[in-house]
């Protein structure tokens, strides 16, 4: 039997240790959907979606309003039955199950919501205990389990507090503890941080990441915020009008998004050429201004030196930045290249096209870049 020590993952809450059994590793998908379609009238909320989620994975599902995210989650926990397709949870097909047969499946799935959904007349401990009481757990076991969960989420000193006495982040921690009460295999997080301030959002994401790492808990993370995906997801699926527009490891999708909807949603996190340079762009000039997207091995080396050595043109950094996602460097740089020698410039652009994720000539400026 394996055990794991779990900490709350935030400096604003007391870090604690709880011993909880970690599930055994398995290669079989814990969630699998095949050609799932759900219609509302003549509108397909999800339209032939197929996906699989590995045990212990954090899968981010992102899209604009109306993309089908919430419908997809409701299909996973059996609240919506698809019109066609199959859904397997831990190897069991659930679309044909009646409510009685679905009940034990749902106990394997925890839910965290945007608006907390806590009972205002019950304390934090009582809110967490409620699903255990409904499930028939003896009182002594409930008390022990609730204490463990409060410790896990860093709220041991808030057990007797009512929701009105808690901050937004503390309410969400109670919601997470309640979702984990029955020891689910999968946690569905539906916009769980969208009502929180940025600092509290980071503390909740750190808690989810820590729980995932230490317990092996599988998390399906529904959000419209790319920054949430960037911080904790292993893989991302982009939904658009009920279809999967793009999917892949988070760092690869962020480094070089292929679909227009992904590119649009990533704009808020992507550096832009400053206005002082945009206003100078012309069709001809002494310096070519390029946008270069880098990731992986190309971003780890002395990239500018490599360009200069290969083409005899020395790039000049104008603007941009690098980030690290899933341990991989990812970034967008704006560079200037001397444009007098068209042959050398063409060779440099060719080198960039080969070694960078994406290269775009934005225009030219006169004078030094």
From Swiss-Prot:
Binding locations of ATP: 63-70
Membrane topology: Peripheral membrane protein
Annotated keywords: Amino-acid transport, ATP-binding, Cell inner membrane, Cell membrane, Membrane, Nucleotide-binding, Translocase, Transport
SMART domains: AAA (SM00382), NIL (SM00930)
GO cellular component, one term: plasma membrane
Subcellular location(s) of the protein: Cell inner membrane
Catalytic activity reported: L-methionine(out) + ATP + H2O = L-methionine(in) + ADP + phosphate + H(+); D-methionine(out) + ATP + H2O = D-methionine(in) + ADP + phosphate + H(+)
EC numbers for this chain: 7.4.2.11
MF terms in GO: ABC-type D-methionine transporter activity; ATP binding; ATP hydrolysis activity
Record bears the keyword Cell membrane: yes
Record InterPro entries: AAA+_ATPase, ABC_transporter-like_ATP-bd, ABC_transporter-like_CS, ACT-like_dom_sf, MetN_ABC, MetN_ABC_transporter-like, NIL_domain, P-loop_NTPase
Pfam families, per database record: ABC_tran, NIL
Domain ABC transporter per the UniProt entry, residue ranges: 31-266
Keyword Translocase attached: yes
PANTHER family: AMINO ACID IMPORT ATP-BINDING PROTEIN (PTHR43166), METHIONINE IMPORT ATP-BINDING PROTEIN METN (PTHR43166:SF30)
Subunit annotation: The complex is composed of two ATP-binding proteins (MetN), two transmembrane proteins (MetI) and a solute-binding protein (MetQ).
Similarity comment: family membership: Belongs to the ABC transporter superfamily. Methionine importer (TC 3.A.1.24) family.
Record function comment: Part of the ABC transporter complex MetNIQ involved in methionine import. Responsible for energy coupling to the transport system.
Protein name: Methionine import ATP-binding protein MetN
Gene that encodes the chain: metN
């Amino acid at each position: 039997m394996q055990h794991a020590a779990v900490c709350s993952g935030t400096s604003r809450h007391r870090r604690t240790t709880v011993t909880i059994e970690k599930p055994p590793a398995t290669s079989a998908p814990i969630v699998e959907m095949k050609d799932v379609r759900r219609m509302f009238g003549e509108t397909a909320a999800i339209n032939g979606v197929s996906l699989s989620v590995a045990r212990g994975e954090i899968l981010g599902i992102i899209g604009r309003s109306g993309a089908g995210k919430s419908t997809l989650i409701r299909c996973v926990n059996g609240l919506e039955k698809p019109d066609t397709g199959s859904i397997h949870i831990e190897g069991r097909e659930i679309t044909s199950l009646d409510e009685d047969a679905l009940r034990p499946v749902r106990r394997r799935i925890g839910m965290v919501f945007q608006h907390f959904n806590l009972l205002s007349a019950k304390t934090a401990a009582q809110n967490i205990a409620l699903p255990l009481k409904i499930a028939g757990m003896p009182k002594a076991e409930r008390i022990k389990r609730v204490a463990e969960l409060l410790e896990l989420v860093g709220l041991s000193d808030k057990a007797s507090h009512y929701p009105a006495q808690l901050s937004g982040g503390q309410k969400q921690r109670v919601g997470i503890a309640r979702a984990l009460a029955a020891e689910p295999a999968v946690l569905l997080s539906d916009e769980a941080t969208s009502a929180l301030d940025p600092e509290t959002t980071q503390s909740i994401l750190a808690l989810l990441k820590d729980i995932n790492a230490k317990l092996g808990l599988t998390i399906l993370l529904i959000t419209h915020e790319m920054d949430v995906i960037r911080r904790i997801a292993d893989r991302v699926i982009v939904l658009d009008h009920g279809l999967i527009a793009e999917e892949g490891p988070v760092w690869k999708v962020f480094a070089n998004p292929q679909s227009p909807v992904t590119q649009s949603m990533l704009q808020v996190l992507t550096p832009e050429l400053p206005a002082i340079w945009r206003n100078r762009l012309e069709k001809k000039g002494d310096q070519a201004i390029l946008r270069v997207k880098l990731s992986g091995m190309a971003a780890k080396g002395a990239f500018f030196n490599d360009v200069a050595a290969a083409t005899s043109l020395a790039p000049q950094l104008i603007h941009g930045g690098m980030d690290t996602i899933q341990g991989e460097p990812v970034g967008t740089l704006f560079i200037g290249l001397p444009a007098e020698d068209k042959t050398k410039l063409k060779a440099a652009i060719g080198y960039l096209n080969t070694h960078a994720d994406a290269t775009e000539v934005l225009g030219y400026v006169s004078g030094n870049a």
